[in-house]
Amino acid sequence: DLYGGWESPEIIQDYVTYAKTLFENFGDKVKYWITLNEQNIFTSLGWLTAQHPPGKFDDQKTFYQVNHYAFMAHARAVLAYREMGGKGEIGASFAYVPSYALDCKPVNAMAKRDYDELKNFWWMDIYAYGRYPKAAMAYLKKKGYAPEILDEDMEILKKAAGEITFMGVNYYQSCVCEYNPMDGVTPYGTMNTTGVKGSAQELGMQGIYKNPVNPYLMTTDWDWTIDPMGLRFCCREITSRYGLPIVISENGLGAFDKKTEDDQIHDEYRIHYLEEHLKELGKAIEEGCEVLAYCTWSFTDLLSWLNGYQKRYGFVYVDREEEEGGTLNRYKKDSFYWYQGVIKSDGENLYKYCLLYTSP
Protein backbone atom coordinates (compact mmCIF):
# COMPACT_ATOMS: atom_id res chain seq x y z
CA ASP A 1 0.00 0.00 0.00
CA LEU A 2 2.90 2.35 0.70
CA TYR A 3 4.00 2.57 -2.93
CA GLY A 4 1.65 0.36 -4.95
CA GLY A 5 3.40 -2.99 -4.73
CA TRP A 6 4.66 -4.28 -8.06
CA GLU A 7 3.70 -1.02 -9.76
CA SER A 8 6.70 0.72 -8.21
CA PRO A 9 10.43 0.05 -8.71
CA GLU A 10 10.76 0.37 -4.93
CA ILE A 11 9.57 -3.20 -4.63
CA ILE A 12 12.74 -4.48 -6.29
CA GLN A 13 15.01 -3.67 -3.35
CA ASP A 14 12.37 -4.80 -0.85
CA TYR A 15 12.11 -8.13 -2.65
CA VAL A 16 15.90 -8.54 -2.69
CA THR A 17 15.99 -7.84 1.06
CA TYR A 18 13.34 -10.52 1.55
CA ALA A 19 15.28 -12.98 -0.63
CA LYS A 20 18.53 -12.31 1.22
CA THR A 21 16.78 -12.99 4.53
CA LEU A 22 15.74 -16.40 3.21
CA PHE A 23 19.19 -17.15 1.81
CA GLU A 24 20.82 -16.23 5.13
CA ASN A 25 18.48 -18.34 7.23
CA PHE A 26 17.89 -21.35 4.99
CA GLY A 27 20.75 -21.34 2.50
CA ASP A 28 22.50 -24.24 4.22
CA LYS A 29 19.35 -26.38 4.04
CA VAL A 30 17.59 -25.42 0.80
CA LYS A 31 19.37 -26.42 -2.39
CA TYR A 32 16.66 -25.53 -4.93
CA TRP A 33 15.37 -21.95 -5.10
CA ILE A 34 12.50 -20.55 -7.17
CA THR A 35 12.54 -16.76 -7.19
CA LEU A 36 9.05 -16.15 -8.60
CA ASN A 37 6.20 -18.57 -9.21
CA GLU A 38 3.87 -17.98 -12.16
CA GLN A 39 4.80 -14.35 -12.70
CA ASN A 40 2.82 -14.44 -15.94
CA ILE A 41 -0.32 -15.55 -14.07
CA PHE A 42 -0.34 -13.25 -11.04
CA THR A 43 0.35 -10.23 -13.23
CA SER A 44 -2.29 -11.18 -15.82
CA LEU A 45 -4.99 -11.77 -13.23
CA GLY A 46 -4.00 -8.64 -11.32
CA TRP A 47 -3.70 -6.09 -14.14
CA LEU A 48 -5.58 -7.53 -17.12
CA THR A 49 -8.59 -9.53 -15.92
CA ALA A 50 -9.10 -8.00 -12.43
CA GLN A 51 -9.46 -11.44 -10.82
CA HIS A 52 -6.54 -11.04 -8.40
CA PRO A 53 -5.27 -8.00 -6.47
CA PRO A 54 -5.03 -5.16 -7.28
CA GLY A 55 -8.06 -5.94 -9.43
CA LYS A 56 -7.27 -3.81 -12.47
CA PHE A 57 -8.85 -4.48 -15.85
CA ASP A 58 -7.08 -4.22 -19.22
CA ASP A 59 -4.28 -2.03 -17.84
CA GLN A 60 -1.84 -3.11 -20.54
CA LYS A 61 0.81 -0.46 -19.99
CA THR A 62 1.01 -1.12 -16.26
CA PHE A 63 0.92 -4.88 -16.85
CA TYR A 64 4.14 -4.81 -18.86
CA GLN A 65 5.79 -2.34 -16.50
CA VAL A 66 4.89 -4.51 -13.50
CA ASN A 67 6.40 -7.50 -15.27
CA HIS A 68 9.62 -5.61 -15.93
CA TYR A 69 9.93 -4.74 -12.25
CA ALA A 70 9.25 -8.38 -11.37
CA PHE A 71 11.97 -9.47 -13.81
CA MET A 72 14.37 -7.05 -12.12
CA ALA A 73 13.45 -8.38 -8.68
CA HIS A 74 14.07 -11.93 -9.90
CA ALA A 75 17.40 -10.98 -11.49
CA ARG A 76 18.74 -9.11 -8.49
CA ALA A 77 17.67 -11.93 -6.16
CA VAL A 78 19.56 -14.43 -8.33
CA LEU A 79 22.67 -12.23 -8.29
CA ALA A 80 22.39 -11.73 -4.54
CA TYR A 81 22.26 -15.49 -4.04
CA ARG A 82 25.46 -16.00 -5.98
CA GLU A 83 27.17 -13.02 -4.33
CA MET A 84 26.36 -14.56 -0.94
CA GLY A 85 28.10 -17.76 -1.99
CA GLY A 86 25.01 -19.75 -2.86
CA LYS A 87 25.96 -22.95 -4.70
CA GLY A 88 22.48 -24.43 -5.13
CA GLU A 89 20.11 -24.49 -8.08
CA ILE A 90 18.11 -21.33 -8.77
CA GLY A 91 15.57 -20.23 -11.36
CA ALA A 92 11.98 -19.04 -11.81
CA SER A 93 8.81 -21.05 -12.46
CA PHE A 94 6.69 -20.20 -15.47
CA ALA A 95 3.09 -21.26 -16.15
CA TYR A 96 3.69 -22.67 -19.61
CA VAL A 97 0.77 -23.18 -22.02
CA PRO A 98 2.34 -24.54 -25.22
CA SER A 99 0.55 -23.88 -28.49
CA TYR A 100 -0.30 -25.73 -31.68
CA ALA A 101 -1.22 -23.99 -34.94
CA LEU A 102 -4.80 -24.79 -35.98
CA ASP A 103 -3.56 -26.03 -39.37
CA CYS A 104 -0.87 -25.36 -41.97
CA LYS A 105 -2.47 -22.14 -43.19
CA PRO A 106 0.35 -19.55 -42.99
CA VAL A 107 -1.67 -16.95 -41.07
CA ASN A 108 -2.45 -19.56 -38.42
CA ALA A 109 1.20 -20.61 -38.23
CA MET A 110 2.09 -16.94 -37.71
CA ALA A 111 -0.65 -16.66 -35.08
CA LYS A 112 1.08 -19.45 -33.17
CA ARG A 113 4.43 -17.66 -33.50
CA ASP A 114 2.96 -14.41 -32.22
CA TYR A 115 1.18 -16.19 -29.37
CA ASP A 116 4.41 -17.86 -28.27
CA GLU A 117 6.36 -14.60 -28.28
CA LEU A 118 3.69 -12.66 -26.38
CA LYS A 119 2.49 -15.36 -23.98
CA ASN A 120 5.48 -17.65 -23.43
CA PHE A 121 8.84 -16.39 -24.67
CA TRP A 122 8.29 -12.89 -23.27
CA TRP A 123 8.96 -14.41 -19.85
CA MET A 124 11.21 -17.37 -20.56
CA ASP A 125 13.58 -15.41 -22.83
CA ILE A 126 14.23 -12.99 -19.97
CA TYR A 127 14.86 -15.79 -17.48
CA ALA A 128 17.19 -17.67 -19.82
CA TYR A 129 18.82 -14.93 -21.91
CA GLY A 130 18.10 -11.61 -20.23
CA ARG A 131 16.43 -10.18 -23.34
CA TYR A 132 12.94 -9.57 -24.67
CA PRO A 133 11.71 -11.15 -27.94
CA LYS A 134 12.26 -8.54 -30.65
CA ALA A 135 8.99 -8.95 -32.55
CA ALA A 136 6.95 -8.83 -29.36
CA MET A 137 8.78 -5.72 -28.18
CA ALA A 138 8.20 -4.05 -31.56
CA TYR A 139 4.48 -4.78 -31.28
CA LEU A 140 4.29 -3.38 -27.73
CA LYS A 141 6.13 -0.22 -28.73
CA LYS A 142 3.70 0.27 -31.60
CA LYS A 143 0.74 -0.12 -29.22
CA GLY A 144 2.31 2.09 -26.54
CA TYR A 145 2.49 -0.76 -24.00
CA ALA A 146 6.26 -1.30 -23.83
CA PRO A 147 7.78 -0.93 -20.36
CA GLU A 148 10.17 1.84 -19.42
CA ILE A 149 13.62 0.29 -19.09
CA LEU A 150 16.66 1.89 -17.46
CA ASP A 151 20.02 1.68 -19.24
CA GLU A 152 21.49 -0.72 -16.69
CA ASP A 153 18.45 -2.99 -16.49
CA MET A 154 19.24 -5.18 -19.48
CA GLU A 155 22.81 -5.69 -18.30
CA ILE A 156 21.52 -6.90 -14.91
CA LEU A 157 18.95 -9.18 -16.56
CA LYS A 158 21.58 -10.69 -18.85
CA LYS A 159 24.01 -11.24 -15.99
CA ALA A 160 21.35 -12.98 -13.91
CA ALA A 161 20.36 -15.16 -16.86
CA GLY A 162 23.89 -16.53 -16.84
CA GLU A 163 23.49 -17.59 -13.21
CA ILE A 164 20.20 -19.52 -13.30
CA THR A 165 20.51 -23.29 -13.49
CA PHE A 166 17.03 -24.44 -14.50
CA MET A 167 13.71 -23.39 -16.01
CA GLY A 168 10.76 -24.07 -13.75
CA VAL A 169 7.54 -25.16 -15.47
CA ASN A 170 3.98 -25.30 -14.17
CA TYR A 171 2.11 -27.31 -16.77
CA TYR A 172 -1.62 -28.00 -16.90
CA GLN A 173 -2.82 -27.58 -20.48
CA SER A 174 -2.01 -26.66 -24.07
CA CYS A 175 -3.86 -24.44 -26.55
CA VAL A 176 -4.57 -24.02 -30.26
CA CYS A 177 -3.78 -20.83 -32.20
CA GLU A 178 -5.70 -19.39 -35.13
CA TYR A 179 -5.54 -15.96 -36.75
CA ASN A 180 -7.91 -13.52 -35.08
CA PRO A 181 -9.17 -10.58 -37.21
CA MET A 182 -9.24 -7.03 -35.88
CA ASP A 183 -12.95 -7.35 -35.11
CA GLY A 184 -12.48 -10.79 -33.55
CA VAL A 185 -12.59 -12.03 -29.98
CA THR A 186 -10.86 -10.19 -27.14
CA PRO A 187 -8.80 -11.49 -24.18
CA TYR A 188 -11.67 -10.72 -21.81
CA GLY A 189 -14.44 -13.23 -22.42
CA THR A 190 -15.87 -15.55 -19.79
CA MET A 191 -13.35 -17.73 -17.98
CA ASN A 192 -14.76 -20.97 -16.57
CA THR A 193 -14.44 -20.62 -12.79
CA THR A 194 -17.57 -22.63 -11.96
CA GLY A 195 -16.71 -26.09 -13.23
CA VAL A 196 -19.59 -26.02 -15.73
CA LYS A 197 -17.98 -27.70 -18.73
CA GLY A 198 -18.35 -25.72 -21.94
CA SER A 199 -18.91 -22.35 -20.27
CA ALA A 200 -15.51 -20.87 -21.19
CA GLN A 201 -15.54 -18.46 -24.11
CA GLU A 202 -12.99 -18.31 -26.91
CA LEU A 203 -10.33 -15.69 -26.16
CA GLY A 204 -7.60 -13.99 -28.15
CA MET A 205 -5.84 -10.77 -29.14
CA GLN A 206 -7.49 -8.88 -31.97
CA GLY A 207 -5.44 -8.84 -35.14
CA ILE A 208 -3.07 -11.50 -33.81
CA TYR A 209 -4.42 -14.81 -32.50
CA LYS A 210 -7.34 -16.58 -30.88
CA ASN A 211 -7.49 -19.89 -29.03
CA PRO A 212 -10.25 -22.14 -30.40
CA VAL A 213 -11.18 -25.48 -28.85
CA ASN A 214 -8.89 -28.40 -29.66
CA PRO A 215 -11.24 -31.11 -31.03
CA TYR A 216 -8.65 -33.84 -30.45
CA LEU A 217 -8.35 -33.43 -26.69
CA MET A 218 -10.63 -34.02 -23.75
CA THR A 219 -11.11 -31.25 -21.20
CA THR A 220 -11.64 -30.94 -17.47
CA ASP A 221 -14.86 -29.56 -16.00
CA TRP A 222 -13.10 -26.18 -16.07
CA ASP A 223 -12.45 -26.49 -19.83
CA TRP A 224 -8.70 -27.03 -19.44
CA THR A 225 -7.35 -29.37 -22.10
CA ILE A 226 -5.96 -32.71 -20.95
CA ASP A 227 -2.80 -33.07 -23.01
CA PRO A 228 -0.04 -35.30 -21.61
CA MET A 229 2.07 -34.89 -24.75
CA GLY A 230 2.00 -31.14 -24.14
CA LEU A 231 4.28 -31.67 -21.14
CA ARG A 232 6.78 -33.43 -23.36
CA PHE A 233 6.38 -30.61 -25.88
CA CYS A 234 7.27 -28.05 -23.17
CA CYS A 235 10.39 -29.94 -22.19
CA ARG A 236 11.56 -30.33 -25.77
CA GLU A 237 10.98 -26.63 -26.47
CA ILE A 238 12.92 -25.52 -23.40
CA THR A 239 15.75 -27.94 -24.12
CA SER A 240 16.10 -26.79 -27.73
CA ARG A 241 15.54 -23.06 -27.17
CA TYR A 242 17.36 -22.56 -23.88
CA GLY A 243 19.51 -25.61 -23.21
CA LEU A 244 18.52 -25.53 -19.55
CA PRO A 245 17.63 -28.32 -17.13
CA ILE A 246 13.95 -28.38 -16.18
CA VAL A 247 12.04 -28.49 -12.90
CA ILE A 248 8.38 -29.43 -13.29
CA SER A 249 7.20 -27.40 -10.32
CA GLU A 250 3.46 -28.02 -10.81
CA ASN A 251 1.39 -30.57 -12.72
CA GLY A 252 -1.97 -31.98 -11.69
CA LEU A 253 -5.69 -32.33 -12.23
CA GLY A 254 -8.41 -30.20 -10.66
CA ALA A 255 -11.68 -32.11 -10.29
CA PHE A 256 -14.93 -32.48 -8.34
CA ASP A 257 -13.85 -35.17 -5.88
CA LYS A 258 -16.52 -36.77 -3.73
CA LYS A 259 -16.09 -38.66 -0.46
CA THR A 260 -18.17 -41.82 -0.06
CA GLU A 261 -20.05 -42.75 3.10
CA ASP A 262 -17.15 -44.95 4.17
CA ASP A 263 -14.66 -42.08 3.72
CA GLN A 264 -13.18 -43.23 0.40
CA ILE A 265 -12.27 -40.98 -2.51
CA HIS A 266 -12.04 -42.90 -5.78
CA ASP A 267 -10.19 -40.52 -8.10
CA GLU A 268 -9.10 -42.88 -10.87
CA TYR A 269 -9.32 -39.95 -13.32
CA ARG A 270 -6.46 -38.24 -11.45
CA ILE A 271 -4.41 -41.43 -11.47
CA HIS A 272 -4.86 -41.75 -15.22
CA TYR A 273 -4.02 -38.07 -15.77
CA LEU A 274 -0.78 -38.22 -13.79
CA GLU A 275 0.21 -41.60 -15.21
CA GLU A 276 -0.04 -40.37 -18.79
CA HIS A 277 1.82 -37.14 -18.05
CA LEU A 278 4.63 -39.01 -16.31
CA LYS A 279 4.97 -41.40 -19.24
CA GLU A 280 5.36 -38.45 -21.62
CA LEU A 281 7.88 -36.88 -19.26
CA GLY A 282 9.84 -40.12 -19.39
CA LYS A 283 9.87 -39.92 -23.18
CA ALA A 284 11.16 -36.34 -22.97
CA ILE A 285 14.03 -37.54 -20.79
CA GLU A 286 14.81 -40.32 -23.27
CA GLU A 287 14.89 -37.66 -26.00
CA GLY A 288 17.57 -35.67 -24.22
CA CYS A 289 15.72 -33.36 -21.84
CA GLU A 290 17.38 -32.98 -18.44
CA VAL A 291 14.61 -33.02 -15.83
CA LEU A 292 15.83 -32.28 -12.32
CA ALA A 293 12.52 -32.69 -10.49
CA TYR A 294 8.82 -33.37 -10.90
CA CYS A 295 6.32 -31.99 -8.38
CA THR A 296 2.61 -32.79 -8.53
CA TRP A 297 0.01 -30.22 -7.60
CA SER A 298 -0.87 -30.87 -4.91
CA PHE A 299 -0.40 -32.92 -1.75
CA THR A 300 -3.66 -31.77 -0.16
CA ASP A 301 -6.77 -30.05 -1.45
CA LEU A 302 -6.45 -26.31 -1.02
CA LEU A 303 -8.39 -23.08 -1.16
CA SER A 304 -8.35 -21.63 -4.66
CA TRP A 305 -8.44 -17.89 -5.31
CA LEU A 306 -11.03 -18.43 -8.03
CA ASN A 307 -12.67 -21.76 -7.24
CA GLY A 308 -12.72 -22.12 -3.46
CA TYR A 309 -12.74 -25.79 -2.39
CA GLN A 310 -14.87 -27.08 -5.26
CA LYS A 311 -11.86 -27.63 -7.54
CA ARG A 312 -9.65 -30.21 -5.85
CA TYR A 313 -6.09 -31.12 -6.82
CA GLY A 314 -4.74 -33.01 -3.83
CA PHE A 315 -3.76 -36.57 -3.04
CA VAL A 316 -5.38 -35.88 0.34
CA TYR A 317 -9.02 -34.83 0.60
CA VAL A 318 -9.88 -31.94 2.94
CA ASP A 319 -13.41 -32.16 4.35
CA ARG A 320 -14.51 -28.64 3.50
CA GLU A 321 -17.41 -27.71 1.21
CA GLU A 322 -18.33 -24.36 -0.31
CA GLU A 323 -21.71 -23.93 1.40
CA GLU A 324 -22.00 -26.63 4.05
CA GLY A 325 -18.75 -26.17 5.95
CA GLY A 326 -16.99 -29.36 7.04
CA THR A 327 -14.83 -30.98 9.68
CA LEU A 328 -11.53 -30.13 7.95
CA ASN A 329 -10.52 -33.76 8.49
CA ARG A 330 -8.07 -35.24 5.97
CA TYR A 331 -8.62 -38.43 3.97
CA LYS A 332 -6.15 -40.11 1.63
CA LYS A 333 -7.53 -40.57 -1.88
CA ASP A 334 -6.91 -43.57 -4.12
CA SER A 335 -4.36 -41.43 -5.97
CA PHE A 336 -2.38 -41.07 -2.73
CA TYR A 337 -1.80 -44.81 -2.52
CA TRP A 338 -1.18 -45.09 -6.25
CA TYR A 339 1.48 -42.37 -6.24
CA GLN A 340 3.03 -43.86 -3.14
CA GLY A 341 3.38 -47.07 -5.14
CA VAL A 342 4.89 -45.22 -8.09
CA ILE A 343 7.54 -43.72 -5.83
CA LYS A 344 8.27 -47.03 -4.09
CA SER A 345 8.65 -48.82 -7.42
CA ASP A 346 10.83 -46.05 -8.89
CA GLY A 347 8.25 -45.55 -11.62
CA GLU A 348 7.74 -49.18 -12.64
CA ASN A 349 4.07 -49.08 -11.70
CA LEU A 350 3.46 -46.49 -14.40
CA TYR A 351 3.65 -49.26 -16.95
CA LYS A 352 1.27 -51.70 -15.29
CA TYR A 353 -1.69 -49.50 -14.52
CA CYS A 354 -4.26 -50.81 -12.09
CA LEU A 355 -5.95 -49.56 -8.97
CA LEU A 356 -3.95 -51.73 -6.60
CA TYR A 357 -3.11 -48.80 -4.39
CA THR A 358 -6.42 -48.19 -2.70
CA SER A 359 -6.87 -47.35 0.94
CA PRO A 360 -6.70 -50.28 3.39
Label every model-predicted segment.
Residues D1-Y353, S359:
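Active-site region of glycoside hydrolase catalytic domains
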